[in-house]
Amino acid sequence: MARIELTDSGVLFNEELHEYWLGEKQLSGIREVLRRQLYPNMYTAIPKRILEMAADYGTSVHKSIEVFQKNWINDGTQELQDFIRICKENNLIHEASEYTVTDGKNWASNIDQVFRSGDDTFIIADVKTYSKMTPEKQELARYQLSCYAMFLEQQVKGAKVDRLYIIH
């Protein structure tokens, strides 16, 4: 079988505003829509400042991983060391970071990690930096990854997603 390569979604992602654009149309991200539908009160009891600090921490961990994968720069953080160990232990072969997928109509999102498991098969992973992985957060991540898998398989003809990982 011929090796399947990931394709560009055509979606422009504005990282600063966290917006997805396909031409003139703004698309919605999956995670927040799922969170609002499944767990609308998930963060209501948490002070805004705490949420901002958690978001900043999550962004820094994601950036640390992305810089390592693109430039082989190891910043020495425990989070990056843990990520490297998890990848080694599970024989994960990096294919892409922050890979944008879309249905081409209404939805788009960035997959944190895409790993190759075969010529036409991929593993997708979401890196979570929650202080505690609750059953609700795990369920939300599973739905999120399932949507990502569906979009990737629609976007990349012939590709299959054979595993979904939550890295926490």
Task: Tell where the protein language model's regions lie, with residue ranges.
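Mg2+/Mn2+-dependent nuclease catalytic core
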Residues: 95-168
